[in-house]
């Protein structure tokens, strides 16, 4: 693998940066912080640097996550906050020479802090999943993608019998399966547990699998792009210091079809049970030796990045039989290590 170079970007945030993410093309970047501000950066080809082009206050409390919508819907951002809100921003023309970000919608259905958000693949419409500390997953949809002012709350899913107590630290995360052509799946981290939900033909979401083995709070969860493979990969970042990678395979489609055809004579939950998917833990790595906070796959699903309290970003590459190996460690304190 080629040597990895690290560049420091001066965000000028006044508090912890809770999230950073690229847009679809990797030419723009956005950060959100506990200082309640969102900052958008554009890449300059001439200087090969990132420059802040827009910034604004996006809530009344710490901002937890920010997400780009697919560019087919325009330049659109969603931001979630500890103030229980999810805000939608759209970049609009201010005049002939400049643009500005405008808040076009505010979703305030949560009864507690919203901790994570995820847009679905654009082929399934303009949908947004939001999970909050009240142990509830909410699915929103902009029925008219050309008008992002109006969002409909399509589903409200209780992840636990009751929310965590005030003495417990809440930990919830969500990630939409990036597959464009298959069924719609959502992976959810719920305290020490992780689940996969599937949408049926009636638009209802049901739990179809569990990702086992976690012994502490799950901080992040993500799907790998399938790239035409017959299975999925899901990674989790956990407070117990482990990065875990799961292989998920669907059962025979004919069985699902038979169950769907017989749906009128079956109960609502009968098509969806914890045997609908085959889940296998194929990797468990404790290289961080401390709490792991984030994990993400690259666009081909062959390299996984993880970051933890050790101040390092570790890159994991898939080898034969989906065995992942740490190939590089990136740290701001020293030159990136090639392993």
Curated annotation (Swiss-Prot):
WD repeats: 12-51, 58-99, 109-150, 166-209, 213-256, 287-326
GO molecular function, one term: structural molecule activity
PROSITE patterns referenced in this protein's UniProt entry, alphabetically: WD_REPEATS_2, WD_REPEATS_REGION
Transmembrane intervals: none
Highest taxon listed in the record's lineage: Eukaryota
InterPro entries recorded: Sec13/Seh1_fam (IPR037363), WD40/YVTN_repeat-like_dom_sf (IPR015943), WD40_repeat_dom_sf (IPR036322), WD40_rpt (IPR001680)
GO CC aspect terms: cytosol; GATOR2 complex; nuclear periphery; nuclear pore; nuclear pore outer ring; nucleus; Seh1-associated complex; vacuolar membrane
Record localization: Cytoplasm; Nucleus, Nuclear pore complex
Repeat listed as a keyword: yes
Family membership: Belongs to the WD repeat SEC13 family.
Assembly: Component of the nuclear pore complex (NPC). NPC constitutes the exclusive means of nucleocytoplasmic transport. NPCs allow the passive diffusion of ions and small molecules and the active, nuclear transport receptor-mediated bidirectional transport of macromolecules such as proteins, RNAs, ribonucleoparticles (RNPs), and ribosomal subunits across the nuclear envelope. Due to its 8-fold rotational symmetry, all subunits are present with 8 copies or multiples thereof. Component of the npc107-120 complex which consists of nup85, nup107, nup120, nup131, nup132 and seh1.
Name of the protein this chain belongs to: Nucleoporin seh1
Gene field: seh1
């Amino acid at each position: 693998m080629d040597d990895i170079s690290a560049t420091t970007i001066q965000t000028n945030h006044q508090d912890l940066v809770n999230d950073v993410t690229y847009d679809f093309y990797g030419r723009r970047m956005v950060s959100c912080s506990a200082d309640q501000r969102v900052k958008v950066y554009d890449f300059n080809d001439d200087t090969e640097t990132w420059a802040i082009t827009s910034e604004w206050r996006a809530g009344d409390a710490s901002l937890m996550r920010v997400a780009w919508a697919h560019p087919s819907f325009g330049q659109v951002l969603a931001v979630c906050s500890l103030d229980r809100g999810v805000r939608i921003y759209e970049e609009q023309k201010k005049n002939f020479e400049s643009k500005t970000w405008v808040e076009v919608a505010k979703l305030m259905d949560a009864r507690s802090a919203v901790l994570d958000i995820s847009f679905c693949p654009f082929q399934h419409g303009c949908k947004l999943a939001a999970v909050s500390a009240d142990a509830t997953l909410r699915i929103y949809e902009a029925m008219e993608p050309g008008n992002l002012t109006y969002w409909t709350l399509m589903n409200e899913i209780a992840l636990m019998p009751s929310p965590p107590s005030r003495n417990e630290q809440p930990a919830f995360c969500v990630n939409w399966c990036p597959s464009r052509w298959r069924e719609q799946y959502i992976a959810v981290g719920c305290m020490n547990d992780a689940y996969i939900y599937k949408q049926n033909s009636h638009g209802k979401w049901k739990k179809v699998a569990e990702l086992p083995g976690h012994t502490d709070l799950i901080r992040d969860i993500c799907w790998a792009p399938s790239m035409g493979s017959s299975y999925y990969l899901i990674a989790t970042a956990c407070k117990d210091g482990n990065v875990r990678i799961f292989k998920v395979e669907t059962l025979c489609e004919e069985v699902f079809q038979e169950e769907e055809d017989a749906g009128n004579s079956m109960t609502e939950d009968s098509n969806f049970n914890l045997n609908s998917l085959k889940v296998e833990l194929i990797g468990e790595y404790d290289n961080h030796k401390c709490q792991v906070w984030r994990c993400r796959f690259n666009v081909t699903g062959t390299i996984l990045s993880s970051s933890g309290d050790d101040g390092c970003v570790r890159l994991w590459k898939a080898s034969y039989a989906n065995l992942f190996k740490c190939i590089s460690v990136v740290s701001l304190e020293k030159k990136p290590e090639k392993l």
